[in-house]
């Protein structure tokens, strides 16, 4: 009898992992759908728009120094459905008065009867944002996140528009990865850039069905910024910084106090590029960390280097750009690299006085953060 009971318990445990549970969350207009599952003990999600698959079943989960929470997991609770309806002002983007409407649901994943983390999903008409909320384990009130299983599986036939990330400590003054590499256009899936993944945001085309934009938002000092790593079979996963960045100082594995939260991972879906271009999800799901001490006024400016490069760094050309800014009604000029040697400190002060007479301010490039000991550190006008 004991053997029969034991067999039954094992069968139920295996069956639960094999078949799993799933839950669907729709955007307000009912077109965008996220399906969250724990089939096979593996947390996952998929994304459909108007019934068409834009992300196939994609992995979720994290691995920490407290354990591997990417497998043998169970979806033990689906929170009550709620909604967000917010309007805010942001004067530095094309849509200065975004209105954000989304449906919200929290999915609790457990292991061996213990709650490990919630995954909070917010789904609007074209945007998905999700993050992990990690629970303390007994008296352990902190952890190190070794890696995220968080992934995005693109359908077969998808193509990519991605910016490969450079290896660390190379390029100009050893500043790479400086996120200035060229995008590849309409390339096949299954690559990993130059071997180091890709820089957000990452754009994909789902054949003739539409577009997918993958990115992140809400990154603070409590976690690290991430990149996207290309794998096989259309899978792309979250990757932490490269070991050699910042001369190898520090760790690439974020540590966090518990309970703690990760940044938001975002997915924007559209039949056309319009929802991709118009999305404000990177602002919609975050709140200001603090109130500004004053109301800052933003303005337009000019920059010679983007057109003329290093050769444009001379007194006469910078004066011409000051005149150009004044004629256009712009408020500033960015004076880029080499101004200290090609214009000089005395002449740059003269330029600053001339600019002030025209109602134009100068921003002078400072290279304190990179390997340029001959460059000035603190000079501004």
Residue ranges and their predicted role:
Residues 1-22:
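Bacterial Sec-dependent N-terminal signal peptides
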Residues 22-278, 282:
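N-terminal accessory beta-strand-rich subdomains and adjacent acidic, glycine-rich linkers
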Residues 305-307, 338-340, 365-367:
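Active-site beta-loop-alpha junctions enriched in small/polar residues
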Residues 310-313, 337-346, 371:
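Acidic-and-aromatic substrate-binding clefts and catalytic sites of carbohydrate-active enzymes
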Residues 368-381:
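Single conserved hydrophobic/aromatic residue that forms the stacking wall/gate
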């Amino acid at each position: 009898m004991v053997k029969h009971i034991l067999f039954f318990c094992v069968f139920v445990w295996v069956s639960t992992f094999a078949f799993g549970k799933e839950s669907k969350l729709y955007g307000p207009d009912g077109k965008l759908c996220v399906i969250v599952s724990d089939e096979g003990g593996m947390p996952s999600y998929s994304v459909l728009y108007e019934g068409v698959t834009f992300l196939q079943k994609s992995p979720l989960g994290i691995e920490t120094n407290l354990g591997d929470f990417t497998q043998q997991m169970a979806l033990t609770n689906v929170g009550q459905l709620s909604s967000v309806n917010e309007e805010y002002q942001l004067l530095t983007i094309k849509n200065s008065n975004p209105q954000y409407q989304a449906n919200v649901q929290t999915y609790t994943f457990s292991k061996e009867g213990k709650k490990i983390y919630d995954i909070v999903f917010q789904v609007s008409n074209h945007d998905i944002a999700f993050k992990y909320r990690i629970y303390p384990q007994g008296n352990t009130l902190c952890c190190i996140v070794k890696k995220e299983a968080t992934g995005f599986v693109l359908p077969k036939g998808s193509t990519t528009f991605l910016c490969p990330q450079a290896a660390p400590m190379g390029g100009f003054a050893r500043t790479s990865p400086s996120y200035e590499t060229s995008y590849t256009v309409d390339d096949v899936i299954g690559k990993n850039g130059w071997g180091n993944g890709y820089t957000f945001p990452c754009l994909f085309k789902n054949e003739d069905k539409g577009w997918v934009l993958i990115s992140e938002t809400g990154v603070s000092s409590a976690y690290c910024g991430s990149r996207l790593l290309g794998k096989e079979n259309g899978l792309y996963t979250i990757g932490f910084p490269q070991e050699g960045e910042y001369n190898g100082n520090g760790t690439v594995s974020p540590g966090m106090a518990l309970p703690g939260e990760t940044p938001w991972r975002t997915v924007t879906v559209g039949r056309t590029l319009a929802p991709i271009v118009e999305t404000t999800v990177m602002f919609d799901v975050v709140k200001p960390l603090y109130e500004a001490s004053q109301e800052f006024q933003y303005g337009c400016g000019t920059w010679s280097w983007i057109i003329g490069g290093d050769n444009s760094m001379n007194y006469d050309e910078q004066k011409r750009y000051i005149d150009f800014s004044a004629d256009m009604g712009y408020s500033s000029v960015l004076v880029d690299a080499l101004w200290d040697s090609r214009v000089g400190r005395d002449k740059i002060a003269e330029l600053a006085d001339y600019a002030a007479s025209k109602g134009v301010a100068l921003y002078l490039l400072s290279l304190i953060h990179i390997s340029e000991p001959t460059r000035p550190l603190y000079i501004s006008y």
